From Swiss-Prot:
Gene behind the chain: coaX
EC number from the UniProt entry: 2.7.1.33
Binding site for ATP: 6-13, 125
UniProt protein name: Type III pantothenate kinase
Binding site for K(+): 122
Length: 249
């Protein structure tokens, strides 16, 4: 079996897949290296012989996690690296190494699935969009704050905005004008994300008409799903690209 890791700025997403058919056996999201080791150590009847990961953390943080995994589970993790080209996709950044690896693998994975022009929107701590044409050329993309960043900035810099996560969840049940602070903030931020997503569609249509695929991924994908009815919601899109970047025999 294979342990796959997507090490983001805030969380580590993990899953264990079968080596022969890539079926997902187990998975989850944790907030720290220690929590990851605890979860993996407590899995019943599950062992893995290989590990591959993508990380947007610092080199030191990534090396520390690789060392912990090697010492604890006797595996040799393979790490995704920046590339100018992968699986038919050409990196569109002027300095290809500066493109976030999670973004890179997400749209490489999307192009692999679609084999056509595609728009990829990832809604996590940050929100990103990327455009890949039918020939695999990455045309660039956009980055803006995601729901957690927008919410936390308002809570941090506006003294009278205070509410908990339970209130936040309830507030998103509807998108009518808010009659309480939590409703106003959560719904306002949600509408901003939806507006961002719709603008990406307009840009993609300017390139390709309606001849393109739309992929949405990330923890907050559900917030825009209803305004993108033709989109494919693929929570593990980064892992699709990771398998292409780090094939294991």
């Amino acid at each position: 079996m294979i342990l796959e890791l997507d090490c983001g700025n805030s969380f580590i997403k993990w899953r264990i897949t079968a080596k022969n058919d890539a079926a997902v056996i187990s998975g989850g999201v944790v907030g720290s290296d220690a929590a990851l080791l605890m979860h993996l150590s407590n899995l019943p009847d599950t062992s893995f012989t290989d590990c591959r990961l993508v990380s947007v953390r610092s080199a030191e943080e990534t090396a520390r996690l690789v060392s912990l995994l090697a010492d604890t589970f006797s595996v040799a993790p393979v790490c995704a690296e920046p590339a100018q080209e992968l699986a038919g996709v050409i990196n569109g950044y002027d300095d290809f190494a500066r493109l976030g690896l999670d973004r890179w693998l997400a749209f490489v994975g999307a192009y692999h699935l679609a084999r056509s022009a595609c728009l990829v929107i990832d809604l996590g701590t940050a929100v990103t969009s990327d455009f890949v044409d039918a020939g695999g050329a990455h045309l660039g993309g956009f980055i803006c704050p995601g729901m957690p960043l927008m919410r936390n900035q308002l809570r941090t810099h506006t003294r009278r905005i205070r509410y908990d996560d339970t209130e936040a969840e309830k507030a998103l049940a509807r998108l009518v004008p808010g009659r309480a602070t939590a409703e106003a903030v959560e719904r306002g931020c949600s509408l901003m994300l939806r507006g961002f997503a719709l603008t990406q569609i307009e840009i993609a249509q300017g390139y390709w008409g309606n001849d393109f695929a739309i992929f949405v991924t990330g923890g907050d994908a559900a917030l825009v799903a209803d305004v993108l009815p033709g989109a494919r919601i693929v929570p593990d899109l980064v892992f699709v690209g990771l398998a292409l970047a780090c094939p294991l025999r």
